[in-house]
Every structure is written in structure tokens, then in C-alpha cells.
């Protein structure tokens, strides 16, 4: 199959994928806050660098899981990393 980066993802496919993840891993609707995850990815990609978005999302999940994994802890981890990326200084000039 094609790599994900070679495909475009219509909004309904995003919902379908999220539903599949929720079912596979027995997650509730609040366990996978799509809008906050996408915000994190966008802010990190723009504020830090595009390649840092996937592992920043992974880090948010890891932090949330180690903190107990409640929906509130998921939101807190996402918000913390999003805030860090939003305040990240532009390092493109310092070479």
C-alpha cells in the first residue's frame, strides 16, 4: 500500500480511523481528543519543525499514560506540549 504521506485524508476517513482506534484499544470518546491532537501536530509542525509533530504526539500520549491516562491527563499533556511548541524560538537562523 501507499505510505500515509502519499495520501490525502478526507475528514470522514479521519473519523473512521479514530473509531477503529477506539474500538481496537477500547477507548472512550474523551480518550482520543482529535481536535487537540491535530492542534498539537499543527503547532509543533509550524513552531518547531514538521518532522517533530509525530513524535511530539507520541510523547504526549506517553506523558499522559505515565500520569495515569485519564482524559484530563491526556488534555493536559497535549496542552503542555502545544504550549511549549508555540513558545519555541525560531532556530532557523542560527546555523
Task: Identify the residue ranges that each predicted region occupies.
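C-terminal binding/interaction regions
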Residues: 5-7, 21-22, 69-95
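Long, acidic, intrinsically disordered low-complexity segments
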Residues: 1-25
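Amphipathic, hydrophobic secondary-structure cores in small proteins
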Residues: 29, 34-67
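S-adenosylmethionine-dependent methyltransferases
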Residues: 16, 23, 27, 39, ...
Amino acid at each position: 500500500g501507499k505510505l500515509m504521506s502519499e495520501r490525502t485524508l478526507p475528514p470522514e476517513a479521519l473519523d473512521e480511523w479514530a473509531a477503529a482506534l477506539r474500538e481496537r484499544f477500547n477507548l472512550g470518546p474523551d480518550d482520543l481528543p482529535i481536535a487537540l491532537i491535530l492542534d498539537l501536530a499543527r503547532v509543533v509542525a509550524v513552531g518547531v519543525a514538521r518532522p517533530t509533530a509525530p513524535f511530539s504526539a507520541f510523547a504526549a500520549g506517553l506523558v499522559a499514560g505515565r500520569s495515569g491516562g485519564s482524559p484530563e491527563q491526556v488534555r493536559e499533556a497535549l496542552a503542555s506540549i502545544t504550549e511549549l511548541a508555540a513558545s519555541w524560538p525560531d532556530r532557523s537562523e542560527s546555523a
